[in-house]
């Protein structure tokens, strides 16, 4: 999601906070931002701050004195938290009509969806002949100490993984799932780079 901060930073440049992988050399950021500058006739200052949870925490800490104009890259897991801090200015994009209605999650237009993705596991197809098809498959003892996950306290993908298990197993069953998965975990990392880097 893209959001406009309340009381944005007053500067000649437009400051955008985003997550690292969006603005990485292999991410879409460099191309998107260059085209945006050309289209709007403005100069962007893009600040990459880790994953989207880290970016949101920075904006919360700066609420009294915002240093950015736009936050690009919140995911669904962080929206409710962000709304509780009253950080965003409503903005009705003229392009919102092109966005499928099931992706328009905020009737107050505090956020504008710009992409979506799926939660999935990355695996080495040369080492693993047949990929697991479900969360339940990951409980198989053949995966003992072979699974790396991201911490939901420090990682947006980790939080999405936690929410995925709650959606599948319910409030009553997700903790049992995690207990059963524990022997198969090699590591719980702070974020994307440590898990996949």
Spans of model-derived segments:
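Class I S-adenosyl-L-methionine
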Residues: 33-37, 60, 83
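Bacterial N-terminal signal peptides
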Residues: 1-6
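Extracytoplasmic ligand-binding site segments that recognize negatively charged/polar headgroups
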Residues: 12-13, 19-29, 50-54, 66-197
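Short, polar/charged alpha-helical segment
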Residues: 17-45
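Short, well-structured alpha-helical segments in soluble
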Residues: 57-64
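Sec/Tat signal peptide C-region and signal peptidase I cleavage site
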Residues: 7-11
């Amino acid at each position: 999601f893209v959001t406009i901060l309340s009381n944005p930073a007053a500067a000649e440049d437009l400051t955008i906070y985003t997550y690292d992988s969006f603005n990485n050399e292999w991410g879409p950021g460099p191309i998107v931002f260059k085209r945006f500058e050309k289209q709007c006739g403005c100069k962007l200052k893009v600040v990459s701050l880790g994953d989207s949870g880290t970016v949101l925490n920075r904006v919360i800490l700066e609420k009294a004195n915002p240093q950015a104009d736009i936050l690009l890259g919140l995911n669904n897991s962080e929206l409710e938290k962000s709304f509780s801090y009253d950080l965003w200015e409503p903005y009705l994009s003229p392009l919102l009509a092109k966005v499928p209605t099931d992706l328009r999650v905020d009737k107050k237009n505090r956020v504008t969806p710009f992409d979506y993705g799926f939660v999935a596991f990355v695996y080495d197809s040369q080492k693993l002949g047949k990929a697991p098809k479900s969360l339940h498959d990951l409980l198989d003892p053949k995966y003992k100490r072979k699974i790396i996950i991201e911490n939901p306290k420090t990682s947006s993908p980790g939080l999405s993984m936690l929410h995925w298990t709650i959606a599948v197993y319910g409030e009553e069953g997700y903790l049992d799932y995690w207990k059963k998965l524990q022997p198969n975990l090699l590591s719980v990392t702070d974020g994307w780079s440590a898990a996949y880097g």
